[in-house]
């Protein structure tokens, strides 16, 4: 029982330690990407339109 408990705690600890960085990085990048993608997409479209109209 003690061994299984140790393994469980270690696994949980390892997962917790390993996931935060990935999770934070992923969520941050996803959120940033989503927000910027919507804004940048609109901006890119406007820029392309302006460039085309200017050209």
UniProtKB/Swiss-Prot annotation:
Biological function: Plays a key role in the replacement of histones to protamine in the elongating spermatids of mammals. In condensing spermatids, loaded onto the nucleosomes, where it promotes the recruitment and processing of protamines, which are responsible for histone eviction.
List of residues that carry Phosphoserine: 9, 36-37, 40
Entry comment describing in which tissues the protein is expressed: Testis.
Keyword Phosphoprotein: yes
Protein name: Spermatid nuclear transition protein 1
Span list, region Disordered: 1-55
Family to which this protein belongs: Belongs to the nuclear transition protein 1 family.
GO cellular component: male germ cell nucleus; nucleosome; nucleus
UniProt signal peptide: none
């Amino acid at each position: 029982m003690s061994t299984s408990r140790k393994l469980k705690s270690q696994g949980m600890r390892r997962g917790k330690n390993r996931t935060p960085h990935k999770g934070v990085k992923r969520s941050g990048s996803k959120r940033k990407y989503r927000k910027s993608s919507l804004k940048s997409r609109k901006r890119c479209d406007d820029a392309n339109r302006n460039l085309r109209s200017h050209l």
